[in-house]
């Protein structure tokens, strides 16, 4: 949502696709730049500016963006050379590139740099927006219970909103109405870009990242603990957890929205797609590697192709979804299934023909993030999960020979799923005597590794932000930050901003309701613990927001907050998940009541509650048993505490190397992504991350570099078409077939892949006999 606020604001004149300047725009070449006078040179750009002022602003830009990984090397080198040489010809050219448009090719590819005065606050925009966000919020709540999860994104809403907006005038009456002194019409004119943009902003605000954390809390309570606080608690939980974040985000907009470097890559798909829907003109083949098709027609082809294709991996031939052919050959070989399996293995041959596997679990389209983000995530996945986890697992560390390689479950010392009811009191707190008599908790190798990497990422993001973004934050915190305004930000000034105190009141009001929520129900969450949770959110908003705004990779705070509260108030499982609206809640309640065998591993239509299962396991680890028993020195997973140190040290090493070699590729290394780019694993699998990374490399590196014209014109439209086709097909399959019990006739392509140890989550090297246990001797754990 935040980035999109800049996308549909006013822009200065440019071409439709942002590739070439229009005749009205004054782009100065060396020959056009005025000669430097003896005392006071003038740089003639779209507005006259003194040479000294231009040099100062470029120097400020250089300082703020010195380590910006989204700027190309040539750009930074040109700016540095021009500033040092004080050459007005070079300064004129670079000044236009940096301040009169956007210095980022991604933004120029998707956003026009001129504005049209069009109405947007219309009854049509609000009616369509509210209708579609209501429907999509419910669908996302339902799909979050499915594996792999699927998100109805705002791109889908864009497509559906377009024919509704265009057809509005055909059914609505004419006439002008007067409400509270404000005149409005049911027919405000042709459906336009800004109305469409308002609908998209509503969609991003309602379900920009799928469903809220509160849904995982409710699934963990209802689906795994059998606990239900009722509608009153659920409604307050939904409102407070969603709106507290809006208050914090609004207060931080000077640092996370206004800077040009905060590109919010996911919003670029929205803007490119809206332009494609409203502009059906053909493409200039000289600017797009020979392609002349309009973006609108191209989108339709991709959309239809994606829709038709998903019937195969999603319903007719499900073996195409996880193409782990090696496991089909040896379905009962433990090592083969651990190494090559795509469900609970490492997927060493990561092949999938299913866009859901590539974009599921909130990874989103790999055509969106910049290449450096994809590369860091790929390197992190290979290093930590393929190399390190393989070594740990086959060394027998953490008693891994008795456990799966990769899943999101917790286990006892007999290799069975951890039975939480054996250690709970009637008040849903820990019974220590029962715990000592039962079993310590064990995790799969990748699941345990994920917790260690989460520790490192939380530490790394703080130090990385201070070192690599500290100067930019400092500049924007002072009046000097205005010197960094690009054309998009400057022209947004004609719109009256929301006062900062509105966000402050929202935050304080929702914080007050949060206290009422946790104190009025038996959550066992103390008021002072809630205050600490809010403070953590405030402190980490800027670091995590900067990473998200520049990479499209979201680093969650849930592990850190669960860890802290687990130490402060151990033995209470519900509060660990509380840390982490109405429509999502209603659909969630319906699904939990009416879908047969929901949240069970073998659920017929894959409604296995993957996110809720992870939250449930986290609540057992951090809330019920407590991190002291699992991660402290001398405990089974105590070694993972060293990841805090690693996350604190690595950013300093990277920064030192970047300072020593300022024109090297070191500035593209991101320690938060190296440690935390795989934050969704589990419930995501190595297959998801590896296939996502490989597709990203193809589009964001190979095609972007070799076919820049095509990439600038069609990359984001390709992403939109694939996402929309997949989503609409999935909705039809689930609503019309899965929920009605209509299955495709059985054949090898749908049955054979489900008989492997990888799919059944039974690929373990050793099993204990009846009456035996593995791990620490009985009763020795604390």
Regions found by a protein language model. Name each.
Residues 2-782:
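Alpha-helical multipass membrane-protein architecture
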């Amino acid at each position: 949502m935040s980035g999109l606020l800049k996308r549909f604001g006013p822009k200065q004149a440019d071409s439709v696709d942002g590739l070439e300047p229009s005749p009205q725009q004054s782009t100065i070449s060396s020959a056009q730049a005025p000669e430097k006078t003896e005392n006071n040179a003038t740089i003639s750009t779209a507005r006259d500016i003194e040479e000294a002022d231009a040099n100062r602003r470029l120097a400020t830009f250089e300082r703020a963006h010195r380590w910006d990984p989204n700027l190309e090397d040539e750009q930074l080198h040109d700016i540095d050379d021009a500033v040092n040489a004080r050459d007005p010809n070079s300064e004129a050219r670079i000044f236009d590139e940096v301040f009169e448009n956007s210095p980022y090719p991604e933004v120029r590819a998707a956003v026009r740099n001129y504005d049209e005065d069009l109405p947007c606050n219309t009854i049509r925009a609000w009616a369509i927006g509210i209708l579609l966000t209501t429907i999509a919020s419910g669908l996302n709540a339902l799909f979050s219970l499915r594996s792999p999860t699927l998100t109805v994104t705002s791109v889908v809403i864009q497509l559906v909103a377009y024919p509704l907006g265009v057809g509005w005038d055909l059914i609505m009456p004419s006439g002008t109405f007067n409400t509270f002194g404000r005149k409005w019409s049911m027919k405000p004119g042709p459906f336009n870009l800004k109305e469409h943009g308002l609908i998209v902003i509503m969609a991003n605000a309602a379900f920009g990242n799928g469903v809220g954390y509160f849904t995982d809390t409710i699934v963990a309570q209802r689906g795994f603990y059998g606990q239900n606080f009722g509608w009153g608690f659920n409604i307050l939980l939904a409102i407070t957890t969603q709106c507290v974040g809006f208050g914090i985000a609004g207060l931080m907009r000077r640092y996370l929205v206004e800077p040009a470097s905060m590109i919010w890559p996911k919003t670029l798909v929205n803007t490119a797609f809206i332009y494609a829907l409203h502009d059906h003109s053909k493409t200039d083949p000289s600017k797009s590697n020979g392609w002349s098709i309009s973006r609108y027609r191209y989108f339709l082809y991709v959309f239809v192709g994606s829709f038709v294709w998903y019937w195969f991996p999603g319903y007719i031939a499900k073996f195409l979804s996880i193409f782990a052919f090696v496991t089909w050959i040896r379905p009962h070989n433990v090592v083969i299934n651990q190494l090559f399996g795509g469900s609970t293995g490492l997927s060493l041959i990561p092949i999938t023909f299913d866009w859901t596997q590539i974009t599921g679990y909130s990874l989103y389209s790999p055509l969106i993030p910049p290449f450096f983000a994809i590369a860091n995530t790929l390197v992190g996945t290979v290093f930590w999960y393929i190399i390190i986890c393989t070594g740990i697992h086959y060394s027998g560390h953490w008693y891994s020979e008795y456990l799966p390689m990769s899943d999101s479950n917790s286990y006892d010392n007999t290799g069975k799923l951890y039975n939480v009811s054996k250690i709970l009191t009637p008040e849903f707190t820990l019974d220590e005597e029962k715990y000592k008599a039962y079993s310590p908790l064990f995790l799969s190798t990748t699941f345990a590794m994920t917790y260690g990497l989460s520790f490192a990422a939380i530490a790394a993001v703080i130090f990385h932000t201070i070192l690599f973004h500290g100067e930019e934050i400092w500049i924007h915190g002072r009046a000097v930050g205005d010197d960094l305004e690009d054309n998009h930000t400057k022209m947004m000034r004609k719109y009256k901003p929301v006062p900062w105190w509105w966000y402050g009141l929202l935050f304080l009001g929702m914080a007050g309701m949060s206290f009422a929520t946790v104190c009025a129900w038996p959550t066992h969450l103390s008021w002072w613990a809630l205050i600490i949770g809010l403070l953590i959110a405030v402190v980490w908003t800027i670091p995590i927001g900067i990473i998200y705004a520049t990479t499209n990779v979201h680093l969650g705070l849930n592990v850190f907050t669960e860890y802290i509260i687990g130490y402060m108030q151990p033995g209470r499982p519900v509060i660990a998940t509380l840390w982490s609206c109405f429509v999502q809640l209603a659909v969630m309640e319906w699904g939990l009541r009416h879908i047969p065998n929901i949240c069970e591993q073998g659920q017929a239509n894959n409604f296995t509650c993957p996110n809720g299962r992870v939250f449930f396991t986290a609540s057992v680890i951090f809330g019920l048993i407590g991190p002291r028993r699992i991660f402290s020195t001398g405990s089974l997973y105590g070694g993972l505490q060293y990841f805090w140190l690693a996350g604190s040290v690595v950013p300093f090493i990277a920064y030192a190397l970047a300072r020593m070699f300022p024109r090297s590729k070191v500035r593209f290394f991101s320690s938060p992504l190296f440690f935390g780019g795989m934050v969704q694993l589990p419930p995501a699998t190595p297959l998801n991350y590896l296939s996502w990374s490989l597709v990203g490399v193809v589009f964001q590196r190979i095609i972007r570099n070799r076919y820049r014209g095509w990439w600038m014109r069609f990359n984001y439209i390709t992403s939109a078409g694939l996402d929309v086709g997949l989503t609409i097909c999935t909705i039809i399959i689930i609503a019309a077939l899965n929920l009605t019990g209509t299955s495709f006739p059985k054949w090898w392509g749908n049955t054979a892949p489900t008989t492997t140890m990888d799919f059944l989550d039974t690929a373990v090297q050793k099993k204990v006999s009846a009456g035996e246990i593995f791990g620490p001797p009985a009763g020795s754990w604390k």
